[in-house]
Amino acid sequence: MRVLIKNGTVVNADGQAKQDLLIESGIVRQLGNNISPQLPYEEIDATGCYVFPGGVDVHTHFNIDVGIARSCDDFFTGTRAAACGGTTTIIDHMGFGPNGCRLRHQLEVYRGYAAHKAVIDYSFHGVIQHINHAILDEIPMMAEEGLSSFKLYLTYQYKLNDDEVLQALRRLHESGALTTVHPENDAAIASKRAEFIAAGLTAPRYHALSRPLECEAEAIARMINLAQIAGNAPLYIVHLSNGLGLDYLRLARANHQPVWVETCPQYLLLDERSYDTEDGMKFILSPPLRNVREQDKLWCGISDGAIDVVATDHCTFSMAQRLQISKGDFSRCPNGLPGVENRMQLLFSSGVMTGRITPERFVELTSAMPARLFGLWPQKGLLAPGSDGDVVIIDPRQSQQIQHRHLHDNADYSPWEGFTCQGAIVRTLSRGETIFCDGTFTGKAGRGRFLRRKPFVPPVL
C-alpha cells in the first residue's frame, strides 16, 4: 500500500519544509517535491496543514487495577482515544502485581491485556515493587527482551527505601535500562493526610494540601543525589508538577548529570482551583494540581528546553467510580485523569499557536525525545526514509471546543470540557494506515504491535 501526503508542511524536531511525503508498506520511503509514486496509491491533500510524526505518549495506565478499582479504559478504548488524538505509540506503566511476584509476571499479564485490543503500537515500562536477588537478576534479561525502562515508586503500597533504590539504580544502569520514578515523600504525605482526616477535612481541596509541592521536590532532589551515588545512573522523573523540582533538575543538568523530566497537560493548563468546584473529586490525581505560579514555571521549562517530554499519565476512573468509592473523602478516591486523546491538541494550541514553542519544539516534546529516551528512535518520532509511517496531520486554521461526548475514551467526563483549542487533529496514520479521519475512528482492535525497545542511550544533554 502506498500513501502520498501532498502540499503539507512536514515538521521534525530539527526543521520543517513544505514537501510531499511518501509511505510505502508502512514505512516512509521519500520526502521531496512533486513525488510521483508508482500506481496504485492513496493521495492525501494536506494543504495548509502541519504534517508531524505521530505522537509517542510514554506515560499511560490502561486497564490498571489499583486495589480499590480498575481503570475504565482498557487497551482498546485507551489506544482508540490515543489514535483519535494523534498519538500512534504508547508506553504503558504496568500496575503492581501480586506481592512477591517476578518482574516477568506483570509483563505477561499486560501483554495479554494488549495483544488483541491495542489499536496502535505499544510497549511497557517494567515496574519494580520490591528488591531481592531474583529481581535484580531478572532486570538484565528483561532489558535484553526489549524492556529498556523500569519504574520505581517512592510512595504508595510498594514504595522502595533508599537502599532498594540504590540497588535498582545500579542494576538498571548496568543493564542498559533507564530508571523512571514517581517522586513524592510518602512519610510527609501520610502525616499531612492523617492530620486532615482526624480533623474531618476530607474535601477534594485537602488532597492537594496533603501533598504539597515540597513533598514532590524533596523526593526529586533525593533521587537525583541517589542516582549520582549509584554511579551517575540515568534518571527520568515522571509527571513534574512544580517549579522547585524543576530547579533541582536544572542544577543537576548544569552539573552534567543524566537526568530527564516529563510534565503533563494538566499541570500546564489546570490548577488547584478545580478542587473547589462542585465536581472537584474528578480532579484527584497525584501529584495534585498546583497554583498558577507553578504553571508559569513549568511553561518556562517547556519554552527553554528544561522539560524534555510532555506525556499524559492517562489513568481513567469514572465519576461514578470516584463518588461511589470515595463517599466524599479525598483519601479514598482513586487517582488519575483521562487525557490521552487531548495531549497533542492541547499542547499545539497552548504552545505552538500562542508562540510559546515552535512546531519543531512541539515534535521534540511529543514524539522525538520520548522516542530517543525510550529506545524507539528513529523508528518512531521522526519522518525520514526508513522510519515508520506514523503521521498526525494538524490543521491550524480550525478551532474546536473539547466536549466529552465527542471523545473516544471510556470515561464519563473530561477534565478539559469546554476548552477551546486552535488547531485540530484531522488525520492520524499508523504505519501508513489511516486510523482516524475528520472526527471518525477508522482503526481496528488488535492491529497494534508490541515494540521491543533498544537499550537506553542518553541523548546529548
Curated annotation (Swiss-Prot):
CC annotations in GO: cytosol
Binding site for a divalent metal cation 1: H59, H61, K151, D313
CDD domains to which the protein is assigned, alphabetical: D-HYD
GO MF, one annotated term: hydrolase activity, acting on carbon-nitrogen (but not peptide) bonds, in cyclic amides
UniProt remark on cofactor binding: Binds 2 divalent metal cations per subunit.
Oligomeric form and interacting partners: Homotetramer.
Known function: Catalyzes the stereospecific hydrolysis of the cyclic amide bond of D-hydantoin derivatives with an aromatic side chains at the 5'-position. Has no activity on dihydropyrimidines. The physiological function is unknown.
Protein name per its UniProtKB record: D-phenylhydantoinase
Organism field: Escherichia coli O9:H4 (strain HS)
Source taxonomy: Bacteria, Pseudomonadati, Pseudomonadota, Gammaproteobacteria, Enterobacterales
